[in-house]
């Protein structure tokens, strides 16, 4: 039995039945990382000794017949912008190279409380800015289905770790699609929760009104398990909602009779690969055959979402990243003439091209002469997009669309084509701008590459997403696929 190919709920079953030890599971994953990660590039840091130590502690509890917790003995990878005490937290940037976190993020605390085994920190686009993980300052992450293709981004390492069987579960962050798009490209399940459902405390900020931590797993049940473990109010993050977190496992039923699903025409227009369209339309038919009521709908302002997103996120990034200046935080240049030179050279040496591009754009739209024309107007557009979604959700329980207009593209194909790269998030960005939840799960294969189905629902209706996603998943076998790597 290959332990690395099992889901979290399968591992929980054999652990609780004492068919395997937590240490055995952990060592299997560490061996797998040592075997394949030089080619896949999922990890930036591996915490081997600590992982084995924690696994041994869980084995002692099992021997004493103590009750296991939600994640006991389950190997988890953490994106390298989420703090884990004693581990590096570089955001895949040279400016934070060598930084070790002195504390745990709230989500990390929750994973540790539920006895998940944290294997290490995962590769990403620098400061979560990118859609391919090609912007990592340290190494490329490769798609396990085809090593010549990208895994998506910015949580590319998080997707590769799960798809490449280097972790059972992982955490990513989603600002404009950074959990859902790599989940789609790598053939796994990824959730962007409602803004405020999961704490951002201890997560290095990119766009503070957009960032959300998102769970990733091999199937819907795994994703629901991790969401239940980390969701909820955090008094250290005033943007978290004081709303009870349901037991998402109860949502995992095959009953979707009467659920109303909207199909927005704006998500099926020009630019969508025809084979992707066909795969998504076939998935919609499955949901309809299983009892859902499917009707067309319209979100007419979606064409403006991408522009609003890049204005708002870049403005917030320029503000958030101002602290990395060589004085307060981050790399300090060794060759400087005066104080101004420290700032200039430290940031020039420390940040990559994409981060510099977005800082400059953000600074521009926040400047006195352009604030009203760009940033203020983008906030107004955002409000209208939110209203658009609310209007649709008066008539529908969920909306279904492709996650990405294409399957995974080749490494280097879009690296120098900024607009083409940005357009790869065209179906995920509107959801982030509105702050509503969405899940991506596999719905097909095209030329050996996975296709992602995106299901979107109203605020704090993650249970609806899990219900519909689970129903579809149980009707097909795409979630059982494993990259032959």
From Swiss-Prot:
What is any one GO biological process for this UniProt entry? translation
User: What InterPro entries does its record include?
Assistant: Amidase (IPR000120), Amidase_CS (IPR020556), Amidase_dom (IPR023631), AS_sf (IPR036928), GatA (IPR004412)
Instruction: Name any one GO molecular function.
Output: ATP binding
Tell me, what's a Pfam family for it?
A: Amidase
- Stated EC number for the protein is 6.3.5.7
User: Member of which family?
Assistant: Belongs to the amidase family. GatA subfamily.
Q: How does it assemble?
A: Heterotrimer of A, B and C subunits.
Protein name as it appears in the record: Glutamyl-tRNA(Gln) amidotransferase subunit A
> Organism, per UniProt?
Clostridium botulinum (strain Kyoto / Type A2)
Record lineage: Bacteria, Bacillati, Bacillota, Clostridia, Eubacteriales
Q: Which gene encodes it?
A: gatA
């Amino acid at each position: 039995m290959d332990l690395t190919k099992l889901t979290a709920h399968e591992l929980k079953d054999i652990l609780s039945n004492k068919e395997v030890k937590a240490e055995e599971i952990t060592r299997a994953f560490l061996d797998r990382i040592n075997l394949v990660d030089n080619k896949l590039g999922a990890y930036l840091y591996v915490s081997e000794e600590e992982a084995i130590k924690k696994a041994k502690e869980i084995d002692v509890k099992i021997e004493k017949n103590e009750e296991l917790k939600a994640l006991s003995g389950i190997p988890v990878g953490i994106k390298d912008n989420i703090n884990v005490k004693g581990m590096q937290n570089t955001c895949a940037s040279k400016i934070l190279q060598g930084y070790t976190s002195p504390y745990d993020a709230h989500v990390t605390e929750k994973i540790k409380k539920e006895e998940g085994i944290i294997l290490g920190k995962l590769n990403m686009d620098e400061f979560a800015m990118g859609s391919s993980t090609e912007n990592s300052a340290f190494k490329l992450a490769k798609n396990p289905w085809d090593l010549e293709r990208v895994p998506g981004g910015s949580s590319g390492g998080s997707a590769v770790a799960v798809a490449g069987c280097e972790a059972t579960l992982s955490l990513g962050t989603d600002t404009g699609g950074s959990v859902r798009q790599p989940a789609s490209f790598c053939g796994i399940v990824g959730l962007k929760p409602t803004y405020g459902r999961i704490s951002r405390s201890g997560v290095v900020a990119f766009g503070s009104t957009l960032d959300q931590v998102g769970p990733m797993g091999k199937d819907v049940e795994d994703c629901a398990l991790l969401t239940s473990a980390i969701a909820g109010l955090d008094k250290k993050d005033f943007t978290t909602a004081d709303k009870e977190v349901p037991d998402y496992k109860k949502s995992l039923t095959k009953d979707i009779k009467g659920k109303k699903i909207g199909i927005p025409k704006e998500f099926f227009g020009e630019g969508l690969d025809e084979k992707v369209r066909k795969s998504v339309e076939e998935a919609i038919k499955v949901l309809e055959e299983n009892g859902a009521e499917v009707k067309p709908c319209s979100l007419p302002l979606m064409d403006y979402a991408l522009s609003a997103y890049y204005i708002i996120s870049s403005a917030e990034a320029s503000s958030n990243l101002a602290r990395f200046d060589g004085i307060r935080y981050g790399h300090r240049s060794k060759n400087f003439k005066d104080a101004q030179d420290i700032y200039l050279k430290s940031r020039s040496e420390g940040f990559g091209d994409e981060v510099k591009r977005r800082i400059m754009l953000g600074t521009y739209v926040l400047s006195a002469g352009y604030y009203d024309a760009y940033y203020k107007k983008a906030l107004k557009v955002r409000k209208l997009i939110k209203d658009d979604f609310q209007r649709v959700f008066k008539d529908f329980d969920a909306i279904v669309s492709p996650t990405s207009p294409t399957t995974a593209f080749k490494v280097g194909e879009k690296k120098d084509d900024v607009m083409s790269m940005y357009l790869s998030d065209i179906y995920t960005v509107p959801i982030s701008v509105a702050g509503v939840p969405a899940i991506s799960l596999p719905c097909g294969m095209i030329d050996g590459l996975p296709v992602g189905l995106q299901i979107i629902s109203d605020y704090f209706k993650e249970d609806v997403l899990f219900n519909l996603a689970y129903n579809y998943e149980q009707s097909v076998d795409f979630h059982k696929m494993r990259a032959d790597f």
